[in-house]
Structure formats: C-alpha cells, structure tokens
C-alpha cells in the first residue's frame, strides 16, 4: 500500500479511492471525502479524520483502526453500527442500550431507522453467562 504517513490530505476528494494497505499514520484527513474508499488494512493510527465523510467505506478493525482522531459525527456513525449488531449477550445489550441516545444522532437515522432499547430480560441470551 501507499506510504502516506503524516501526509496533508485535508479536504482531498478521495471518493472511491483504493487506500487498501495504505499507511496513513498521522495523516491529516480533516474534511476529506473518503466516501466509498477502500480502507481495508489501512493504518489510521494517529490520523485526523475530523469532518471526513466515511459513508460507504470501511473502518479497519485491527490495531491500525485504533487511536484515530474523529469528530462527533464519525463517533456517532460508529456507535450506530455497533448498536445494529445482532448479539444477544446481556453485557452487549447493556452497553448498547447505554449509548442509544448518542447512536440515534446518526446522520442517516432517517433512512436506516431509529434504534430502540432491547429488554435484557427478554433477550435470547438472558440468564447465560457472558462468553458461553
């Protein structure tokens, strides 16, 4: 992948860009259009994505997706996606329910639907120990 460490890409139009395996560590991606960008295995550690558009792209779920500077809009978007997981573990449901008001501020909630609390007592995993 491309070595874009500490690159100034603020405001760049990277719509649909192939950034797979790119090293974007410490890069300035503020207000960048990353809609539809391929961020698989991209290293975003320390990158600044405040104000960036990540719609229809992907968030790296490895160490390269940790410690990324984001704005509330992106945090809400990630929270909404977390809350849409199909997991019946009571600990997950408690965590999910705790952040619902935040997650429902998602900018696409009108088209995706407002999330409602799940009753832990009625969840299929109720009564089971976590991780079993």
Predicted features along the sequence, with ranges:
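Intrinsic low-complexity/IDR segments
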Residues: 1-6, 10, 15, 25, ...
């Amino acid at each position: 992948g491309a070595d874009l460490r500490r690159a100034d890409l603020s405001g760049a139009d990277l719509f649909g860009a192939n950034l797979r395996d790119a090293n974007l560590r410490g890069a300035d991606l503020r207000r960048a259009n990353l809609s539809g960008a391929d961020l698989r295995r991209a290293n975003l550690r320390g990158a600044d994505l405040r104000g960036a558009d990540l719609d229809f792209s992907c968030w790296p779920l490895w160490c390269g997706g940790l410690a990324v500077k984001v704005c509330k809009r992106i945090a809400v978007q990630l929270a909404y996606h977390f809350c849409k997981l199909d997991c019946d573990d009571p600990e997950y449901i408690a965590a999910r329910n705790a952040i619902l008001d935040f997650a429902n501020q998602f900018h696409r909630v009108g088209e995706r639907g407002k999330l409602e609390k799940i009753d832990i007592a009625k969840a299929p995993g109720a009564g089971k120990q976590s991780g079993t």
